[in-house]
Swiss-Prot record:
GO terms for cellular component: nucleoplasm; ribonucleoprotein complex
Naturally occurring in which organism (per UniProt): Homo sapiens
Every RRM domain range: 155-230, 284-360, 400-477, 925-1001
SUPFAM superfamilies to which the protein is assigned, alphabetical: RNA-binding domain, RBD
Residue numbers carrying Phosphoserine: 98, 101, 112, 250, 254, 278, 280, 292, 294, 377, 575, 591, 638, 710, 718
Keywords in alphabetical order: Acetylation, Isopeptide bond, Phosphoprotein, Repeat, RNA-binding, Ubl conjugation
The protein's name in its UniProt record: RNA-binding protein 12B
Residue ranges with Basic residues bias: 263-278
Modified residues (Phosphothreonine): T276, T640
Gene label: RBM12B
Source organism superkingdom: Eukaryota
Length: 1001
């Protein structure tokens, strides 16, 4: 379908070739360019398709011969009529509207254009509603008549289709030669021109001349000129005139066309001053919107700088005794009025001010509606008319509160305060909403000090916070009461008392109070704090360590020892096993208190009350001496004698005996065996050298005398059940004395001689000869077919970097190194007995005779040692490679150690097992996961292996040297069959947007 485009601004020197060149790439049929020319440089171009026309319109504003052109959608009828009008002008018909025939042709042209527009698919501005709008409201029926009048009925004309940037001077130029008395531009609700205007002429003769300018151009626009009315002029802010004024002006001779219309307008003003029918003062009114609540008349005068404005011309609008964001301003002159309208959407105190024209009638209605409510409220404010209901309504009318939604359900008041960081909010001004079960709804109510602050806070609507888009709504206190919350009723004294009791940690007040929690936390949050306080009391161990709130002191019974919960004080004073049990913890404290403090402190209270000091003296002195007698005699003396004599006789000598000699026999050797780690960190580090000196007799006797016989002889009151109850102390203290003393003699002396001398000779001689000469015949004997497969994987593994032990190194190197260290590590670190004793990897290199005889010949192997299974005795698997140890133990980080800090591949000295090695179905089998998303975490990997028996702590995500994820991870299955099943089922399954690859390590 052919589409016609109208072009304006074509230069005089341009031709059809230039137009076609401008529309390069678009299809213009032959004969599709029609140049009209003229002052506006008009042309019509026909395009073959709608798409070409759409793309052509997008080139509006381009340049043809250094001249900017504008493009508009047109029709064939408009093009034909324009061409006909151009031809008639060439014949000499003159300008349209200069005669009757011109008017007839113009009217016929309009009718034809209307018919063509109704038939074509493109709408025209003529067949649209001719009613014009201001502030979104239509007024009157202004459709053009089918038969245009030759003379104007009144001096008012209505213009449609004006450019949006037009001003009054442009209108006067458009009606050049006519006396224009005034122009009112109609605007949208946002203050922009809508393309319509009302023009008032000095007389009906001038208005009739203006009607002849219908469908003339103003810039690049067709302007429609229609008859207006005085009612429209007054309704949109114009001033009415007397009936005689128009007659008087019509009788006057119109000035020549060349006379300045402004001079004529001034002279006409002096002869016939304008007066309104209502005899109200003259003025132009504007409606100001979106004003800041803090501005005053002075700010508006500065805003409308350059205008003649006083405080009496400014009127702020009030509603319910509260000032709104609306105001009205009256200007005395049209110039000031136009200056004010040009400031539309100008920012005043951080708010864009909307300036709309308004008629006096509408302004009075506006003010009357508000003033009526205000006067009623003033009457109720008089004495005798004040009621409680009205006071509540007046307060609730102020929107001081904000209802917040879409917070996280566990939001706290501190987080709400962070959201409103620019406002000073107390916790009492925030109320969190919970459901009937005490679970947070993610909603809150916040009260501000003034309505202005609340309105500023409402600007944070849809601000993202804590991962969600927070929604805000300004509400009044009456609406807040619908939530069951009344901020005004909350007693500040009660909240202050609650806050003070909360700071003191008064638990009785927290649990006995029946009042609803109306302060910083909701009901459920308050209950959560109570539970935390209870947990802290139940888990109390020591006031300096585990009690988190230092201002809450436990009773005196809790301060003596960390084990007061388990044993009564009587058991502590009489049981020697109790002395032995806290020796690891309390042995350090008495030593620091006794040897670093002044010695007088020990005699200020009787030894029965302080049960720590008698223990130390019980350790220092032999059992034959009764150490309580001198103390009882000392306490009977006066304090002065006690202080003067005791330090010289009793205190300076016993410490020399007890601390310098007896501790060497009693304290220091048993802790060397039982508590190997604490003495290194504890006191007396310079004396650590004495631990190794004591003779073996003292090493064995003190434990038998002090630890084993004393409970039976002197301390028979303590029950034996207390020692068996706590498993930690049962295994930490008694078992080390029973098990650790014999093993040093048993393992430190015989094993080095037994394992370092005979086993190396036994293992060094046979294996080199056995592996260098007979291994091929010895291991190729059983299945020949099974041996032919491994060489392929054997060579594959040698190409990989992670296999650090090729067969050449395994069989040609001396195997002594493999058997030197495991025996030492076996007895020095008992945690690795199952792996590093002569175990799987070591026995693979031995002949079958050695594998079967070694466990029988060595009775001192650990109890949990088991000979290797049949899988490792099979010759093909043993011949393939030396399988180093892969530590699947739990390191400090809680993850399995698959490499150095879980970064990259396995370290040197280890290798990743071959998936096809017959390593047994009962062994832990690692799987490597590749092509993982970089953001995948451990939980997603565990979910991926849901249903398979995976070791949870074995998941290890691999990282590169920069600490970034490589998209690979390693997991461990409990056996080989489970790993193969997972690889078979889960390979190429998606984890997020990626399909992962699974391989055995």
């Amino acid at each position: 379908m052919a589409v016609v485009i109208r072009l304006l601004g074509l230069p005089f020197i341009a031709g059809p070739v230039d137009i076609r060149h401008f529309f390069t790439g678009l299809t213009i049929p032959d004969g599709g360019v029609h140049i009209i020319g003229g002052e506006i440089g008009e042309a019509f171009i026909i395009f073959a398709t709608d798409e070409d026309a759409r793309r052509a319109i997008s080139r509006s504003g381009g340049f043809i011969k250094d001249s900017s052109v504008e493009l508009f959608l047109s029709s064939k009828a408009e093009m034909q009529k324009t061409i006909e009008m151009k031809r008639t002008d060439r014949v000499g018909r003159g300008r349209p509207g200069s005669g009757t025939s011109g008017v007839d042709s113009l009217s016929n042209f309009i009718e034809s254009v209307k018919e063509e527009a109704s038939n074509s698919g493109y709408g025209s501005s003529i067949n649209q509603d001719a009613g014009f709008h201001t502030n979104g409201t239509g007024h009157g029926n202004l459709r053009p008549r089918k038969t245009r009048p030759l003379k104007a009925e009144n001096p008012y004309l209505f213009l449609r289709g004006l450019p949006y940037l037009v001003n009054e001077d442009d209108v006067r130029v458009f009606f050049s030669g006519l006396c224009v008395d005034g122009v009112i531009f109609l605007k949208h609700h946002d203050g922009r021109n809508n393309g319509d205007a009302i023009v008032k002429f000095a007389s009906c003769v001038d208005a009739s001349g203006g009607l002849k300018c219908h469908r003339s151009f103003m810039g690049s626009r067709f302007i429609e000129v229609m008859q207006g009315s005085e009612q429209q002029w007054i309704e949109f802010g114009g001033n009415a005139v007397k009936e005689g004024d128009v007659l008087r002006r019509s009788e006057e001779h119109s000035p020549p066309r060349g006379i300045n219309d402004r001079h004529f307008r001034k002279r006409s003003h002096s002869k016939s001053p304008r007066r309104t029918r209502s005899r109200s003062p003259l003025g132009f009114y504007v409606h100001l919107k979106n004003l800041s609540l803090s501005i005053d008349e002075r700010d508006l005068r500065n805003f409308f700088r350059g205008t003649d404005l006083t405080d009496e011309q400014i009127r702020f609008l009030y509603k319910d005794e509260n000032r709104t964001r609306y105001a009205f301003v009256m200007f005395k002159t049209l110039k000031d009025y136009n200056t004010a309208l040009s400031l539309h959407k100008t920012v005043l105190q951080y708010r864009p001010v909307h300036i709309d024209p308004i008629s006096r009638k509408q302004m009075l209605k506006f003010i009357a509606r508000y003033e009526k409510k205000r006067s009623g409220s003033l009457e109720r404010d008089r004495p005798g008319h004040v009621s409680q209901k009205y006071s509540q309504e007046g307060n609730s009318g102020q929107k001081l509160c904000i209802y917040i939604r879409n917070f996280p359900f566990d939001v706290t008041k501190v987080e709400v305060q962070k959201f409103f960081a620019d406002f000073l909010l107390a916790e009492d001004d925030i109320y969190l909403l919970y459901d009937d079960k005490g679970v947070g709804l993610g909603e809150a109510l916040v009260k501000f000090k003034s309505e202005e602050q609340a309105m500023k806070a409402e600007r944070l609507n849809r601000r993202r916070f804590l991962g969600t888009e927070v929604l805000l709504r300004l509400i009044s206190e009456a609406q807040i009461q619908e939530f069951g919350v009344n901020f005004s009723v909350m007693s500040s004294e009660k909240m202050q008392a609650r806050s003070q009791s909360r700071e003191r940690g008064d638990h009785s007040h927290l649990f006995d109070s029946k009042d609803p929690p109306i302060y910083s936390v909701g009901a459920f949050e308050n209950f959560r704090h109570q539970l935390e306080d209870l947990r802290q009391l139940d888990n109390f161990k020591h006031p300096q360590r585990d009690f988190r709130q230092p201002d809450r002191h436990p009773p005196e019974d809790f301060r003596h020892s960390s084990e007061d919960f388990r044993f009564p004080p009587e058991d502590f004073r009489h049981s020697p096993e109790d002395f032995r049990r806290p020796r690891e913890e309390d042995f350090r404290r008495p030593s620091e208190e006794d040897f670093r403090r002044p010695w007088e402190e020990d005699f200020r209270r009787p030894p029965e009350d302080d049960f720590r000091h008698p223990r130390e003296e019980d350790w220092r002195r032999p059992l034959e001496e009764d150490w309580r007698r001198p103390l009882e005699e000392d306490f009977r003396r006066s304090p002065t004698e006690d202080f003067r004599q005791l330090p010289e006789e009793d205190f300076r000598q016993p410490p020399e005996e007890d601390l310098r000699w007896l501790p060497e026999e009693d304290f220091r050797r048993p802790p060397e065996e039982d508590w190997r780690r604490p003495p290194e960190e504890d006191f007396r580090r310079p004396l650590q050298g004495e631990w190794r000196r004591p003779p073996e007799d003292d090493f064995r006797r003190p434990p038998e005398e002090d630890f084993r016989h004393s409970p039976e002889e002197d301390f028979r009151q303590s029950p034996q059940e207390h020692f068996r109850r706590p498993p930690q102390e049962h295994f930490r203290r008694p078992p080390p004395e029973h098990f650790r003393r014999p093993p040093p003699e048993h393992f430190r002396r015989p094993p080095p001689e037994h394992f370092r001398r005979p086993p190396p000779e036994h293992f060094r001689r046979p294996p080199p000869e056995h592996f260098r000469r007979p291994p091929p015949e010895h291991f190729r004997r059983p299945p020949q077919e099974h041996f032919r497969r491994p060489p392929q994987e054997h060579f594959r593994r040698s190409r990989e970097e992670d296999f650090r032990h090729p067969p050449d190194e395994d069989f040609r190197g001396p195997p002594d190194e493999d058997f030197r260290h495991p025996p030492d590590e076996d007895f020095r670190s008992p945690q690795e007995e199952d792996f590093r004793c002569p175990s799987d990897e070591d026995f693979r290199q031995l002949p079958e005779e050695d594998l079967r005889e070694a466990p029988e010949e060595d009775p001192r192997l650990p109890d949990n040692f088991r000979p290797p299974g049949e899988d490792f005795r099979s010759p093909p698997d043993d011949f393939r490679s030396h399988r180093p140890f892969v530590n699947f133990g739990r390191p400090e980080g809680g993850k399995f150690d698959f490499g150095k800090h879980n970064m990259g591949s396995f370290p040197e000295g280890r290798f990743m097992p071959d998936p096809k090695i017959n390593c047994g179905s009962g062994r832990v089998t690692p799987i490597k996961i590749m092509n993982l998303p970089f953001k995948a975490n451990v939980n997603e990997i565990l979910d991926f292996f849901h249903g398979y028996r995976i070791i949870p702590d074995s998941v290890s995500i691999q990282y590169n040297e920069q600490g970034l994820p490589t998209g690979e991870a390693i997991v461990a299955m409990i056996n080989y069959n489970e790993a193969m099943a997972a690889i078979k089922d889960l390979n190429d399954r998606p984890v997020g947007p990626r399909k992962v690859k699974l391989t055995l390590l």
